Amino acid sequence: MNEPLVRAALQQAGLSGDIHLESFGVTGNNHVLLGRAGDRAFLIKQYFQHPDDPRDRFETERTFYAFLSDAGIRSIPKPIAWYPEGRLAVLEFVQGEKPRAATPGLVQEAMDFFLEINRQRENPGAKSLPLASEACFSVAEHLATVEHRIQRLGRIAPESPRHEAAINFVRARLSPAWIHLRERIERLSAQASSLDVNQRCISPSDFGFHNTIRHTDGRLRFFDFEYAGWDDPAKTICDFFCQPAVPVPNDWLPSVLEKVSREIGGDDVAGRVALLLPVYQTKWCCIMLNDFLPSGSQRRLFSNPGLDDSRRQKEQLEKAMASHEKAFP
């Protein structure tokens, strides 16, 4: 991370003098430093960008944090400063631990956060929020999003035995299973219509316990809103149950759907989730294989310069294969 840019961002945040900076360790998409000034701790986050992935993560997250703050939602790290020149954010450092396993209480807390956000849908600030990354408002759009990911994986270059193993998995298992699933969903949804505006939700996107910290006060703090915006609530729920880092048992899906459908999207949400859940199980298998694509590999190295790329690729392939076998035995 460029130190003059970091110092400029910290100065804008009113932080100067004796500041200690250190790597924050393993992160997903971005380069993060932990800073300390006296008894004050904070994070400096630099956002990844790549020609193959031009999404403006910095501006999306800044806009969403502003929306949450204006709405009085406090279960988030407090933003301290934004520095567009270096695509840097300075955020409150939340003391606590990542949840190691989902519990009914944590799931309820996460859904309370999601619903609290969506009670602000009629606020003026909500109208200016962008569409979420890969937003989908019809079954066809959900299918097209995953189809695009499958097609990208079909272009993995055979540059190592690990890559060849990934290619074999995509060709022999992932792609054939997807073709069968896609055709079945297309038949089942032939008469489905697109979502009305009032059926859409404000989605944190990439929503799950992998993007939370349990604060020392016992409550969750939610973060990482780089893909947030308007979306289909069924997609938000499917992602929540499909993300692999802190799995949420499908047994809890009915209670979540009952809670959410009372406030967002109505009874149609449950039907779309039932239809689309295997689509999103496939999507998350694709996401696990992003490390075999140039933009995915470079994003990981950007966030963690010391990363052992070969070891991670091996682990990600094993996870993708296991997840796919569990979902599609």
Model-derived regions: residue spans:
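Active-site acidic catalytic loop and adjacent metal/ATP-binding pocket
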Residues: 25-44, 183-236
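Short Pro/Gly-enriched beta-strand edge/turn motifs at strand-loop
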Residues: 12-19, 60-62, 185-196
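A cross-family kinase active-site recognition segment
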Residues: 98-180, 193-200, 230, 300-318
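A general structural signal marking secondary-structure boundaries and capping sites
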Residues: 69-72, 114-125, 157, 244, ...
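ATP-binding pocket architecture of kinase catalytic cores
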Residues: 29-148
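ATP/Mg2+ or Mg2+-diphosphate-binding catalytic cores
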Residues: 286-329
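Active-site activation/catalytic loop segments of kinase-like enzymes and analogous catalytic loops
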Residues: 233-267, 278-299
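Juxta-kinase regulatory segment immediately upstream of eukaryotic protein kinase catalytic domains
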Residues: 1-21
